[in-house]
Amino acid sequence: MTRVCSVWLSLLLVACGAADPGASDGATDPPASDAGAEDAGPPPRTTAPTLPEPTGACPETFANGRVTVSPEGIAPREVQVWIGDAAAEQDGPLIFYWHGTGSRPEEAEYGLGPDTMEAILAAGGMVVAPIRDPEAGDFPWYLTAGTGDDDLRVADEVVACAMETVGIDPMRIHSIGMSAGGLHTTQMGYRRSSYIASVVAYSGGLYLPRLPPIEDPANRFSALMFHGGESDVVIIGFEDATERYHADLTARGHVAFICDHGSGHTIPTAARASVWAFFQAHPFGAESPWSEGLPADFYAPCGLTP
């Protein structure tokens, strides 16, 4: 029945010309709601990521502009890369950015902001915004309204090849996205918890009765999630989807922060400095230093509870 409802909803979204739907889960995904309620407690925390290995030919290097990766089992895909000279001297963070429907990879520059982009590159890191596969359909990412793992395979190949060529900090692999990209980032946190350190979702979350599978339950990654209040609605209500996402992670023992910026379906640009501070404070496997509350200078609408 879940699969039938998902197909019907996808058709409805197309008919309505929506900019972004919610994410759809397959019938094999585990049931939602009280995910950890029957457990004796969370497992011991994972302290080291499990990194993917290259499955195809890696690019010679990662440089500014478009780079092609070749994951096994799917056609080669391009990604947009931002990287600086500092990457030759130090292994910095890798930030994946997933744009919204109708947008472009360059949205990363707006979603992160110029100061954060500069800081990431100065730390020897890079930002990678995958290019959508037209075969994904009306929405940019397979997990926005389906169950295909193609985009996750692209991310895996980027991680593996970046480690092999330019070098990255394996403890600082993060994901961020807006709308369809926020929904994808939500999925990626669960489905690639073997290496994702922490995530930020602008108008993302969970909206169907079933949850995505979690790859490594022992990686209790932290999440920073935003919604724009009651008016943050594009077919689905992102306020409700975000609150459900927050409830599930906290039930699993994760530290999750939720922010109502009150400006509808938009990226809260005033929060961008706090997004970078959040990523810096939450490497892989670490206890959140903010588990009792956020710093005084953090973006004001954010907190531990809705």
Q: Which residues make up each language-model segment?
A:
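Alpha/beta-hydrolase fold nucleophile elbow
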Residues: G167-S179
